Structure formats: C-alpha cells, structure tokens
Amino acid sequence: MQNLYDVIIVGGGPAGLNAAVVLGRCHRKVLLFDTGQPRNLHSEGMHNYLTRDHILPTAFLKIAHDEIKKYGVQFRYIQIIKAHKDGKGIFIITDRKNKTYHSKKLLIATGLTDNIPAIDGFKECYGKTVHHCPYCDGWEVSGKSVGIYAKEKNGFDLAVSLKTWTPSVTLYTDGASNLKPSQIKSLKKYNIGIETNTFQKLQHKKGRLQKIIFNGGDSKDCDAIFFVNGFQQQVDLAKNIGCKMSDKGVVLTNKSQGTNISGLFVAGDASKDMHFVVVAAAEGAKAGVTINKELQKESLEALLNKS
C-alpha cells in the first residue's frame, strides 16, 4: 500500500505531540492530525511543566511543531470524523472532506472539553479568571476572593482544596442542593461560605471577573471562580471505534496506553483523570515507545516468516 503510514496520530495536544517526536526519532512514517483547538487554548499560561512555567499554550505548540518537523513528521490541519480497522488489521481514517488515510497503528489524543456553565460571562472569563483546576491556576489566585461554582456536581472537595491557596472561599450552588448535611457542617467549620442564590451573570472587564450578579439584583465581589461541571470527550472517535469507556467518560487504557483494540492507543486527558499537560506528554511518550516496539516486533516476524 503506497500511502500506508506506520502511525496516524489524531490530536495535536501535548500527548499527541510527544508521541510524534518519539516516533519521528525512531524513523517512523507519522501523520498527525490537529484542529488547533486544545483544551487550554484560552489559558493565559501553562503551569507544572518544568522549564515552561507560564508559557502561553500557543507558544508551547509553536515550539513543539518546530521541533517535531525536524524528524519528518507530517501534519494535517483538518478534523477526523471516523476511523475503523479493516480485515487485514489496517486502520482507515476519514477526514471531514471524506478523504481516507491508512496506518498500521493509531493513536487518539484528542483530549477533553469542559462543560462551561451556560451563564453570561463564564465563557468570556474562562481561562482568565474562571478555571477548573486549582493545581493549574491556584497559585495565581493566592489570597484572593475565590468562588466554587457547583450546580450540577458536588463542590465540597474542590472548595476544601482551594483553602490551600486562599482563606477566602465561597461555594456557590446556583439554587441547587447537592451537599450532604455533614458536608455543610464541615464547610462551616472550615470557614467556607455557602451561597444558594441563582446566578444571572458574571460582571467582568475583558475576562477579569469583578462581581457575581444574582437573579433578583444582589451581587457579590469575586476575583476568580473554579467550576465543577464535568467534561466530555472532544470527539467520540475512540468510543465509536469500540474502545471501552469508564463510568467517568474517559477511555480505558493499560499502562502503555493501549486499549481493548489491538494497535489502537489513547493518551492524554481523553484517557485519564489527572489532567496535567506534563502527564499528557508523558503518556504520549509511553504510547510512542510501545507503538515503536510493536512495529519492531512485527517487522522482525515478517522477515522470519519470509525465510
């Protein structure tokens, strides 16, 4: 097959990119698909990644692309809409223009997308003063007035966690009551406020949160919000091809990022609960090494079968 790739990678975040550099350095024929919409696109800086503290996600991607292209990895900037495995074990990938590509191995690293509350101001503040991970953005709100938005989910754990970074924490339920009586009692002991008024909007200036405006006209000053509203797969590619999923909606993988489908790997946020850039990159590296080892083994077996 003339245009058979060793590996096709779907997803151009840290997991897909790190797998690409590993495989490129192994002289593998690699094609990487990217839509340019990473989960942290609107973030003002990455953290917990040594030597890259507070780098803009776009700057990180540019550095990564420049490095990877040195090793012959090909890029296509288009969405992949489906993938399947044929009877000969070859993966067939189809893009949104209905063009197909073929590979021996497939790595899906498309990540997750956050369910941003559908309240005026949330989307505009997301990545600036509205966040979902205190380990990623907690330092930047140290000592400030921080709110936890938890209508659809129980926000107890996140509220307690934020006390590590600031003494001023309030849990906002937006009219819901997901808290257990014992949790309410504990929050009071931790000096964490509970606000049940329903949200009308976030008052902000260019994404800088100023106040929470409630229905009825009341308001409360607030510097930043962390929300607990769940997430979903950015695309359902892994699920649709038959990968097993966890109850939390992430793809089940083994220690080498392999799935229940032979030759198919998933790395990054799409497969794990700990959503750090550095963890996603490490998973991509693990997947890359395992994929190369499988390709080595298959090549040797093919040579032995010929002799």
Where in the sequence are the language-model features?
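A Rossmann-like FAD-binding core segment of flavoenzymes
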Residues: 62, 68-95, 100-101, 166-250, ...
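FAD-binding core/adjacent interface of flavoenzyme oxidoreductases
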Residues: 1-7, 75-144, 251-255, 259
